[in-house]
A protein has these predicted regions:
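Conserved Class I SAM-dependent methyltransferase catalytic core
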Residues: 251-282
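Short conserved AdoMet
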Residues: 15, 210, 274-275
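A general structural signal for well-ordered alpha-helical segments in protein cores
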Residues: 7, 24-25, 55, 68, ...
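Class I S-adenosylmethionine-dependent transferase superfamily signal
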Residues: 102, 140, 234, 266-270
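Non-catalytic accessory regions of SAM-dependent methyltransferases
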Residues: 1-32, 36-40, 44-47
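Conserved SAM/SAH cofactor-binding pocket of Class I
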Residues: 97-228
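Conserved AdoMet
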Residues: 30-105
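Mobile active-site "lid"/loop adjacent to the S-adenosyl-L-methionine
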Residues: 149, 220-262
Length: 282
């Protein structure tokens, strides 16, 4: 099977997918290591036995409804490549608005806290609550380093909080991958410093969090319970706990159906853990 034949086969198999062309292209890139341009230029190139087997398996899994991101283990968010598994929600483009809002607010924070010599009076403390893959907090740190030129020693102290131990492991892996790459960080000491700015806490909301923060960033579960169950029928395999906004303090169904039960618990706790003048971005 060559690449052109694989494309035709994949599109036919995934004809009921919302985006068969894109799905097939991403899966072929995943199994071959080629980019989109190379796939076009090398369309007559034969897949190896291993590549063909992996491609057919990926198509089979996609047909069950499993998202492409879970098959490849990767999802781009805010221009960065995040590792994902079914232990965490796949980062959504809409959430990038939260990053923009946080960066705009942090720019004002740094401006207000800058001394005449350029040093910073106060380093912001940030909590990424219900962190999942860590995409929100990590994207903020990465953007501050790369785009805003914030020195490593002036980076915010970032606390990632999630009820799921498995999700926190994904956050840790993404932090190591994305903050340990060395882009704009010129020596190993800086890499250590960047990662040392981060802490991870497994907690049901703020139950195990003893700290106060200048910023709390959160994209909590907000989908009504019945809708969450319906969404998962398509085989997407996303974690129910990360979707369902109608869970109680024990992670069980609360009996409500507006998706706001968890948020109504979360917001008062946020204000208890914000410093005077602190900011909640949800």
């Amino acid at each position: 099977m060559n690449i052109l034949e694989a494309k035709k086969y994949g599109k036919e198999q995934l004809k009921n997918s919302p985006s068969p062309d894109l799905d097939v292209s991403v899966l072929l890139q995943f199994v071959t290591g080629f980019d989109r341009t190379q796939l076009l230029l090398k369309r007559d190139c034969n897949l190896s036995k291993e590549q063909e087997t992996n491609f057919l398996d990926a198509i089979k899994r996609r047909k069950t409804g499993l998202p492409v991101a879970y098959i490849t283990g990767h999802k781009e968010f805010y221009g960065y490549d995040f590792y994902v598994t079914p232990a965490v929600l796949i980062p959504k483009p809409d959430t990038e608005i939260l990053i923009d809002q946080a960066l705009n607010s942090l720019a004002l924070f740094y401006s207000k806290n800058e001394n005449k010599d350029g040093s910073i009076k106060k380093i912001p403390e940030i909590c990424d609550m219900c962190s999942g893959s860590g995409c929100v907090g990590i994207a903020v740190l990465k953007a501050l380093l790369e785009n805003d030129g914030i020195p490593v020693n002036c980076l915010p102290k970032m606390t990632f909080v999630d009820i799921s131990a498995d999700a926190l492991e994904i956050t840790k892996k993404n932090a190591e991958r994305l903050l340990g790459e060395g882009e704009k960080l010129n020596n190993p000491e800086n890499l250590t410093s960047a990662l040392s700015k981060i802490r991870f806490i497994q907690s049901n909301l703020f139950e195990n969090v003893p700290f106060s923060f200048d910023y709390i960033l959160t994209n909590p579960p907000y989908v009504p319970h019945s809708e969450s169950l319906e969404l998962l029928k398509d085989g997407r395999s996303e974690p129910l706990l990360a979707l369902d906004g109608d869970v109680d303090s024990d992670g069980e169904y609360s009996g409500t159906e507006d998706g706001l039960f968890l948020i109504k618990r979360l917001v008062p706790q946020c204000f208890e853990h914000l410093v005077c003048g602190g900011t909640l971005i949800m």
